A protein has these predicted regions:
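Active-site loop segments of alpha/beta catalytic cores
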Residues: 1-183
């Protein structure tokens, strides 16, 4: 209700929080690692397009530009619902998107992810569900082939988001073997 009834209060909070992040980003810019993943865990239901466009896009543009000027490669973690945000993912100057989760776990197809990302790097991309013994192995292998076909060489193939506790580690090994054979 605050966003509708008192947007000036929200704007003040966002500005104050952004300023509070200055010290963190100074440290990130000076650290020796060339890679920074913004681990925000973005979900379109928590950050729908109006919030994304008004508050998050300006913030990320500023911070990603700051990191890039320091020589960093920047990615953001988007593993929740993402379909409503697809048209806006390229509004920020990050290098890639991490943990995009296609169907059947997520709400988008691999092709929709590719269209939205364009030349951005995809990190991960394999639904974690495919590592469960209850899912057909052919679903996993088909997904891996399609990801490599659409995204390679702009792909860091991995599990979106983590292997489940009861996931089959042999499927992880299989993905590694497949990746070597596909590229």
């Amino acid at each position: 209700y605050m966003m509708a009834d008192h947007p000036e209060v929200i704007d003040h909070y966002v500005a104050a929080q952004s300023e509070a992040d200055d010290a963190l980003y100074e440290v990130l810019c000076s650290c020796p690692s060339p890679f920074v993943t913004l681990g925000e865990n973005i979900d379109a239901y928590m950050d729908p397009p109006p919030i994304w466009l008004r508050h998050l896009t300006p913030y990320y543009r500023r911070r990603v530009t700051q990191l890039r000027e320091a020589g960093k490669y920047v990615h953001i973690h988007v593993d929740g619902a993402m379909k409503p945000l697809l048209p806006y993912l390229q509004l920020c100057p990050w290098h890639g998107i991490e943990a995009c989760t296609p169907l059947p776990q997520g709400d988008v197809t691999i092709e929709e992810i590719k269209e939205a990302l364009g030349d951005l790097v995809l990190l991960d991309g394999i639904p974690a569900l495919y590592f469960l013994p209850s899912f057909p192995l052919e679903d996993l292998t088909g997904c891996v082939r399609r990801l490599v076909e659409l995204f390679y060489p702009r792909l860091v193939l991995g599990i979106s988001d983590e292997i489940p506790p009861d996931g089959d580690i042999e499927r992880v090994r299989l993905v590694g073997e497949m990746a070597q054979g596909l590229v």
